[in-house]
Amino acid sequence: VCDIHLHLLALSESNGCYVNPKFRRSLVYYLVNLFTDLPSSGSDEERDRQYVENLDGLLDTPFKRHCAILLAMDGVYDSSGELDLNKTPFLISNDYLFQVCSKNQQMLYPGASVNPYRRDALDELERVKELGAVLIKWIPNSQGIDPADKRILPFYRRMSELGLPLLTHAA
């Protein structure tokens, strides 16, 4: 069994992740904490570590037949291709994703996230493929991506050439 929709959550900026202070005060953030295994106490680093341990526990069955594509989440980028932290609700870095997946390669497969408006989008696409990404993940309305934007056609072409499918939310 492979559950393609498993989100990596993280709070600590020490692992390249980010949670916007406004988002930390939102109802969505409260609900994420309520309905996930994200611990409610401890430092951000301790909570991140405990969350990953909880994920491992979910997949650690006697038959070792479960796997998951673990998903990163890129940020919002401005018109010059720079990360806009003010508009980014949260960011789960590809580097952190690969770090977590490398500890359990039999059960966790990396689903990277690359916003096509990044200045280095094509380079990042190549990099994550080389590191073992099995797909690219977007949430267009949260990442400021217009999937019909003709400016991102080269990104789609390169994704196709690399054999990377796109997993995306419609709302």
Short names for language-model regions:
Residues V1-A171:
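Helix-coil boundary/capping segments in enzymes
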